[in-house]
């Protein structure tokens, strides 16, 4: 951490989570290098626990030289239970690779391989049995991203990356949103609307490092509150990087935050009128179809009254890792869903990386929003090319994780030859290559071939995935490198001859 977080910015990031932690939750904090330290024991979150946790967070250091991932997750699993009554989650941050071997040890590779096996087969089993999620966060490229993706995948957690300490806080926040989901109200240009069903709201306002602007809140009745001047009923936590303002029984109407504009500014609420969204997992694969179901609930009961839903606009917005954005209106005032369930299939997600999916409900009397981060990962790598020695076109599908259950996984190939005939065949697993290998022979004549793969994978824990990669299209026969070189040489000779002929003709004329 000395290299990736020299200014200990993970401390204010942790403090933000401590402030956001809901009253009545159970929480604890562990740090780890070679050894694991439970610096804040698991206990019920209240004002006393929060202050103790913030004091302990200040003493977090970067002295650890090793990365005892298996030990940390094993200790943190203490007390987890399928019948705990809680939504159980771990947020794991590391900038290193699993490393339990002493420096210079000759058997370091073997020791670390054993630790990895123990982690995947024994430690994570505790989380799977308890139904607990591990949300993993890789700080910089030094972290073992493949392993952190596996941990998140095996426990239905979210995998995130923070390339530097500056982006760490918002990455922490995305993981926290998965661990402690909450309703929000939409915030546009730092303006938001609170309705009379809201019992409490918490506004998170980020500060820009170069800004000296004081954060203030303007109430619907025109009062101006700041960190220095606000009612006693308002809890205002100020940090060098953010303000967190909690207001109980807020006035209904339009509120304004006088602060820097930041896309991560947001307002979470407590209200009996809630937006419920199902079908957006934390980890997805290329080709996945997400069957999203959205309902408005009041005291847990689904709202299905036509007179309410016909006046409610429901929309969904998807933002890809590269920033591409698409939105769709799901509601039809003339024909709201009879059962109160809005259904939408998302099936064109192909870009690897982290997506942001927002669902927004707006009516004349209320507004609600739910935000989800989901990460698309690539579970297999596909390579292909012509094998000149065997005279075949070779396609290889290799799992990127050693946690793949080879016996239960399948690769199917649909091959279309130049004569337009199509065959479907299973691709065999090659033990030596540790991959599914298919060899396509030139037995249907020269021309264009097309191969569509269907990969159905299963992890050791039983988590399944299906992906349909882009079609592999190639022409056979493929010229060898020497043949290509001969053609290139002949082209040069022909070109040179043509040039001399042109010069000769010019001289004659």
Which sequence ranges carry the predicted segments?
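Aromatic sugar-binding surface patches on proteins
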Residues: 232-245, 251, 334-345, 430-439
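Beta-strand-rich structural segments
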Residues: 289-302, 314, 391-401, 452-454
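C-terminal "exit" segments of structured domains
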Residues: 159, 163-241, 246-248, 256-260, ...
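Short beta-strand elements
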Residues: 272-274, 365-391, 463-499
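Von Willebrand factor
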Residues: 1-44, 69-77, 81, 86-94, ...
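Short, compositionally biased P/S/T/A/G/V-rich stretches that sit at domain boundaries
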Residues: 185-186, 267-289, 295-297, 371-391, ...
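VWA/integrin I-like adhesion module and closely mimicked acidic/polar interface patches used
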Residues: 59-63, 94-155, 162, 167-175
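Surface-exposed, short loops/turns at beta-strand junctions within beta-sandwich domains
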Residues: 248-251, 347-354, 440-449
């Amino acid at each position: 951490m000395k290299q990736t977080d020299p200014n200990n910015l993970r401390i204010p990031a942790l403090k933000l989570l401590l402030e956001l932690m809901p009253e009545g939750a159970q929480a604890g904090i562990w740090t780890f290098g070679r050894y694991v330290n439970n610096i804040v024991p698991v206990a019920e979150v209240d004002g006393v626990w929060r202050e103790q946790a913030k004091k302990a967070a200040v003493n977090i250091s970067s002295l650890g030289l090793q990365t005892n991932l298996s030990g940390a997750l094993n200790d943190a699993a203490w007390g987890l239970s399928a019948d705990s009554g809680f939504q159980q989650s771990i947020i794991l941050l590391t900038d290193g690779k699993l490393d339990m071997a002493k420096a210079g040890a000759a058997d370091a590779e073997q020791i670390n391989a054993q630790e990895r096996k123990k982690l995947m087969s024994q430690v994570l089993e505790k989380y799977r049995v308890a139904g607990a999620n591990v949300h993993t966060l890789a700080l910089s490229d030094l972290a073992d991203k493949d392993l952190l993706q596996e941990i998140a995948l095996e426990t239905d957690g979210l995998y995130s990356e923070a390339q530097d300490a500056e982006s760490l806080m918002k990455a922490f926040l995305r993981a926290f949103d998965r661990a402690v989901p909450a309703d929000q109200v939409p915030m546009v240009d730092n303006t938001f609307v609170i309705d009379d069903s809201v019992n409490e709201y918490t506004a998170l306002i980020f500060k820009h490092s170069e800004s000296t602007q004081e954060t203030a809140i303007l109430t619907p009745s025109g009062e101006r509150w700041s960190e220095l001047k606000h009612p006693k009923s308002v809890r205002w936590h100020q940090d060098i990087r953010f303000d967190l303002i909690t207001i109980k029984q807020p006035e209904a109407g339009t509120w304004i935050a006088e602060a820097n504009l930041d896309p991560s500014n947001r307002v979470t609420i407590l209200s009996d009128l809630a937006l419920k969204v199902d079908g957006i997992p934390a980890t997805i694969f290329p080709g996945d179809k997400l069957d999203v179901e959205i309902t408005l609930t009041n005291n847990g009961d689904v709202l299905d009254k036509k007179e309410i839903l016909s006046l409610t606009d429901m929309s969904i917005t998807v933002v890809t890792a590269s920033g591409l954005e698409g939105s769709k209106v799901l509601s039809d005032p003339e024909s709201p869903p009879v059962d109160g369930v809005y259904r939408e299939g998302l099936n064109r997600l192909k870009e690897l990386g982290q997506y942001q999916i927002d669902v927004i409900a707006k009516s004349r009397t209320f507004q609600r929003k739910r935000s989800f981060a989901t990460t698309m990962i690539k579970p297999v790598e596909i390579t292909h090319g012509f094998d000149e020695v065997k005279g075949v076109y070779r396609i290889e599908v290799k799992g990127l994780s050693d946690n793949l259950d080879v016996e239960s996984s399948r690769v199917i190939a649909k091959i279309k030859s130049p004569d337009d005939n199509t065959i479907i065949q299973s691709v065999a697993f090659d033990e030596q290559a540790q991959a599914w290998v298919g060899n396509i022979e030139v037995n249907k004549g020269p021309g264009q071939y097309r191969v569509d793969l269907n990969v159905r994978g299963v992890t050791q824990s039983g988590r399944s995935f299906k992906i349909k990669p882009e079609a592999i299209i190639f022409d056979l026969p493929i010229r060898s490198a020497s043949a290509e070189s001969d053609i290139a040489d002949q082209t040069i000779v022909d070109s040179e001859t043509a040039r001399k002929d042109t010069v000769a003709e010019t001289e004659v004329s």
